[in-house]
Amino acid sequence: EIYTDHGILTADERITADLEQVFMFLAGEIEEPETQHLLVAPFTLRKGLKRLIKDEAKAAKQGLPSGITLKLNALEDTKMIRALYDASGDGVPMEIILRGICRLLQGVPGQSETISVRSIIDRYLEHPRIYRFHSGGEDRMYLASADWMKRNLSRRVEVAIPVYDPEVKRQLAKLLDIQLADNQKARSIEADGTNPYLRNDEAPLRAQAVFRDF
């Protein structure tokens, strides 16, 4: 029995063709990877994420459904935090699940009223990064290597891979929903520096225990 982080095994040529570009870059055969689907740092990842955030903000301003869910180890990059604050100002609801560093302040009037940040620290050391955007009901989802830190987005080679398979997307969405429903180990990361447990009257749910038997 193995408990591990998320991975994806695919023969989708949209992804494999882009990965070939990444490996050619790493091998020194080309100066910059040219990708159509993968977001690759330090070249297109930051720009692509900002575009996805702006698309959600545009939908919210038009009164259309919108939303962002992020699962990260760390959220430190000031430019990305500003982009999330701007989207919150436009009314985009956001759920952020973090394990470590967080420089974003949730629930600040006029700044981050639509943003909720929680941390789950339990038996297993998690490292998955998932980016989820409502995208007009398309539910665009990425598995990624990068935390939202300046070093990851600007100084390292990192990759965010779009998830196209509907069943894989369904499974990842379920895993996110389980963590968002955790009422045993989840803590709210408050703007005042406190981190109280998130309790409610629902049946006890400990996300990592559910994951173990998933």
Sequence positions of predicted segments:
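Metal-dependent catalytic core segments for phosphate chemistry
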Residues: 8-10, 15-26, 37
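PLD/PLD-like phosphodiesterase catalytic module centered on the HKD motif
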Residues: 1-2, 9-16, 30-31, 42-214
